[in-house]
Amino acid sequence: MKKIQIAIDGPASSGKSTVAKIIARNLGLIYLDTGAMYRVATLVALQEKTEDASKIIQFIENHPISFANGKNGQEVLVGLDNVTEVIRTNEVTNAVSKISAMVEIREFMVAEQQRIAQKGGIIMDGRDIGTVVLPQANLKIFLVASVDERAERRYKENLSKGIPTDLERLKVEIAERDRKDSIRVVSPLKQAEDAILLDSTGKTIKEIVQFIEEKAKKLM
């Protein structure tokens, strides 16, 4: 069986991570949560009260990012600290576009992601996987959904985790993040020329997963 590379890109809350995790489990692939890696960098910036990219990188080099299978799914670790929940707070979410747009941060993360992906048998999701991180990926998906639907998804996710959230404010924040991600100079959100556009508005997670898995199995 061929060890393929799958890249799933798309805007915030389009369902990329949820879909990628399910496909990884179903097809026996490694799931590399690139968004979580940038969220870790953002968390470090907030906790260390710095926007100095070299200091953020040095901290992560001293406390490496790793992923582990926990009781409730994949866990994100920084050194020995479990940051799975804290990197999903609104404070981190609203600052991640700024930190992830730093050239030094992106170069550091991309190098790490490419190193891990070299062996294949991997699925990654993010903003620039198909265009920058894995331009040679066997299968590229660009997953989109309406702002209203994405806000509703994030709203329900936050409530289930006990995070107080205002739905209308979420809509504004997601639309603004779309704008920032699309116009930033370094690796803007952009569909790769050879990516398959998949609009998930009104579709169930099961339907999205099935569509992508059918494409992937033909390449394995």
Curated annotation (Swiss-Prot):
The keyword Nucleotide-binding applies. Its main location: cytoplasm. ATP binds at G10, P11, A12, S13, S14, G15, K16, S17, T18. Gene3D superfamilies: P-loop containing nucleotide triphosphate hydrolases. Its EC number is 2.7.4.25. It is found in: Cytoplasm. Keywords: ATP-binding, Cytoplasm, Kinase, Nucleotide-binding, Transferase. It catalyses: CMP + ATP = CDP + ADP; dCMP + ATP = dCDP + ADP. One of its GO terms (biological process) is pyrimidine nucleotide metabolic process. GO terms for cellular component: cytoplasm. GO terms for molecular function: ATP binding; CMP kinase activity; dCMP kinase activity. Pfam families: Cytidylate_kin. It comes from the Bacteria. NCBIfam families: cmk (TIGR00017). Belongs to the cytidylate kinase family. Type 1 subfamily. HAMAP family: Cytidyl_kinase_type1. This is Cytidylate kinase. It comes from Lactococcus lactis subsp. cremoris (strain SK11). The lineage of its organism: Bacteria, Bacillati, Bacillota, Bacilli, Lactobacillales.
